[in-house]
Amino acid sequence: GDSATFTETGKATYTAVFKDEDFDTQTVTVETPMKSSPEVKMIKNGASVRTSEPYGIRWAAGIRTADWNKLIEVYGENNVKAGVIVAPLDYVKQADEFTISAFNAASLQYADIVSDSFNAEVNAMAEGYSGFYASLVNIQAGNLNRKFAARAYVAVEKDGVVTYYYGEYSAENQARSIYEVSKSAVASSTEKETVKEFAKGVLNKVIDVTVENGNAVLTEIAGYA
């Protein structure tokens, strides 16, 4: 099964174990084009190393604060959630679109990272937005050079129907590997030494992986965690 662990305010982490995943849901889901209000987006292009244990790769996402407050007013706090869908880039290319319903329909594995609160550090990155970090941790060695993509969303539930509003997505801006972000961390003049040590460990573990059509392919590992 899957699990989400909330470790710090506005910092959701997700450890994914996808073997024998059951994709059945208890509610109907409806996908809505990103041009629909409310406005949700990735606060920063790219990704970074998660700076506390367990280390991993993290993205900064957010929703326009005025839109979030209106949704809470209309639907109630328990019926609104902000999150990020994360999946291997090669899976994104297989799906009809990068949405939860498309991945479920294709039986493709993904992580649905839901934040339980907003983070002041991310809020400060974009005026007028409430933001959070979404992290994928405990990535197996065979996936260190594999790109993972992320897309922000906000979802509302009414009468058993869940409606998703997605932010823009592009692989160029939102797909990174832990190898790539580790290289950036090591080169940084401001990153903590503990994070740099983790990043150096990642770089030391990365070996040549099989590449097919430009995609890093899993070695003999069942799922990723």
PLM region descriptions:
Residues 34-225:
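Short, surface-exposed linear motifs at loops/turns and structural transition points
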Residues 1-35:
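Extracellular modular ligand-binding repeats in secreted and cell-surface proteins
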